[in-house]
C-alpha cells in the first residue's frame, strides 16, 4: 500500500498529454455525504501511465431525515416538511388521507356561524389535528395547511368549470365534501353561466332567461308593496271621537299597471296574494273589554294624547292671558310716557312764560328809571 500511495502522489509529467484530462475536483459535500475511493494496484507493464486512470471515486448521498422545519441539503432538494417560507411544501407531500383530515378539520371551523374566514389560531388548531392523525410523513405547519386548502379550492373551481361546460359529473374524491361546504355560493353563478353559454335549443334558453327576469322583477314589486303596506300600517291616527265615529274602512290596494302585472306574473310560478292586510288605522275600543296587548297599548297611547292635548290647551290659554296682560301693561306704560311728556312740556312752557315776564319787568324798570332821571334833569334846568 505504501508503494501505491507513492504512485498516486507523484504523477508523471511526461505522460500528461497522453492521459485523458482529469475531471474537476468535486465540490465540498455536506457532512451526510460519504465518499468511497477505490484504488487498483498498477500492473508492471503500465507503470508509466497516469495514476488517474487507476483511481476511481464514488460519492454516495445518504438521505437527510429532518424534522418538520428542515431547510434541505445543498443539492437543492428541500426537506420533507419545510418551514412554509417556500410556498408551504409541494402537493405530492400531501397524501389523500392527510388531505381528507385537513378538509374535515377546516370544514368544521369554516361552517361555524360567524367564522367564514379562519384566523391564524384556527389554522394552528387545524395543523395540530392533521399532525395528530399521523397521515403525513412530516409535520405540517399552519401556513402549509392554508396553502393546501387554497390549492384544493382551485381544484374545486376547475371541477365546477368542467361540470358547467358539460363534461359530466366530477370524479374527484373531495368534490362532494367541498360542494357541501362552499358550493352554495357558486352554484347559482355556475348554472347561470352554463345557461348563457350552452344553447340548449335556442328559443328554450331565451324563454327561461326572460321568465327568470320577469319573476325577479315581480318579486321586487311584491317586496316594495309589502314594505309600503308595513309603513302605512305603522301610521296610527288617533282622534278624540267615540269608537263608532273613529271606525273607518281601510284604503283599497293600489292597482298595478297592465305592464307591471304582466311582468310580475310569470306563467310557471304565479305570485300568491298576501294572506292578510293590516289596517292603516287602529280601531280603539274605549269600553275596556280587556282585549289583546295591542288594545292596551292603543288605550295607553290614547290617554297620553288626551293628556297632551289638555296640557297644550292650558298652555295656549295661559299664553293668551299673558299676552293680554302684556298688552295691558304696554298700554299703561304708553299712557304714563305720554303723561310724562305732557308734564315736561307744561314745565317747559311755564319756564318760558316766567322768563318772558321777568324780561318784561326788567324792561319796565329800566323805562321807569329813565323817566325819573329825565324828570330830575328837567327840574334842575327850570330852576
Curated annotation (Swiss-Prot):
It comes from the Eukaryota. Residues 263-274 have a biased composition (Low complexity). Pfam families: Myb_DNA-bind_4. GO terms for cellular component: nucleolus; nucleus. This is Trihelix transcription factor ASIL1. Residues 1-32, 61-94, 189-295, 346-383 are annotated as: Disordered. InterPro entries: ASIL1/2-like, Myb_DNA-bind_4. GO terms for biological process: embryo development ending in seed dormancy; regulation of DNA-templated transcription; response to auxin; seed maturation.
